Amino acid sequence: MHSTDLHLEPNEASDLARVFDDDTRARFGWDRAFVTVLDEAAAEDCLALLVHGAGEPLDHGWEAVRVHADPGGDGGRTEDAEACAVHDGHVYILGSQFGEKAGPLTARRSWIARVREEDLAGAPGGQRVPMELSRLRFGLHRAVNDALTRAAVQLLPLGPRSRAAYVDATIAHGAAENKRWAGRVGSADQPINVEAAEFRADGRLLLGLRYPVTADGHPLLVEVHDLEQLFADPDAAPRCGNVWVLGDAGDADAPAGLRGLDTRGGDRFDAIVGDLDAAGKSATVLDDHPQGGNAHSQHIRFELPLTAGGGQVTSERVHDFGELRRVEGVAVDAGGHAHYVIDEEGHVGLRTLVLE
């Protein structure tokens, strides 16, 4: 496995997606280009390009380029970017929809944004790129919880500490401050932590949840419909549909959530699965479920059937990262090399695995 350390400020990187066609990369002298998101910045400052000089060996020739955007009047109102995906000429970015490790949930993390890939190609010149930003105000939280209820998925029970910190405290805050989103978080809800996203062949957005997981510790994916409406109408409510379970990833002793998603076409996906939260960092989820910190990071592959309306699917394991725990994104290039972004102290790690 080839290894490269890149320095960005801030240095908390999540997810990875391929960007630009062959002609665009050639114009800049690159043979590979990816976008990642930095979770300690607002949406307009969360993007970075990771690019590789044409002809350089895989463990050399990488450069990180910060990208700054203009979200109009919503600057500075968002945080915690965790997922990115490319579709139909746009790069989509999602907030986690979650909260601090000690709670409560925060509306600043409930958003989706996009920039045009064509505009992103001009970012190395230093100009801010236009950004469409939709502040969801727990609308996606509501839609995902409703979809999980309709699918009758048995979830890992929400423990008493997590319920108090993430659900009860959020409801109380919304009521006390008369927030616009008051009522969208219900007492029977699960907090959701979105850390992966990708698109199905028909254009539906596929969310990968780090939390919650099933009662047996398996990761969950939820489809989002009518994505365009969220950008056309600031008051539009997200709608979610099919729910999928990766039935052979994770288990009751080492539950696993999704950390990254990638597709090279069709409904075949590469994914990173791993622990529900980082151990040793006072995460409330792990106070209730200590086993949630046990799962290794793994690269897996799976395929979603075209006609089924959700349900359980199988996967195959590509790579187990062992003690390397903070693997947060995967993208497979045209040559079959799997690239991973690693959230490491003080720098952003990029690893490349040459697949057989």
Indicate residue ranges for each PLM-predicted region:
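Sequence/structural signature of beta-propeller domains
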Residues: 1-356
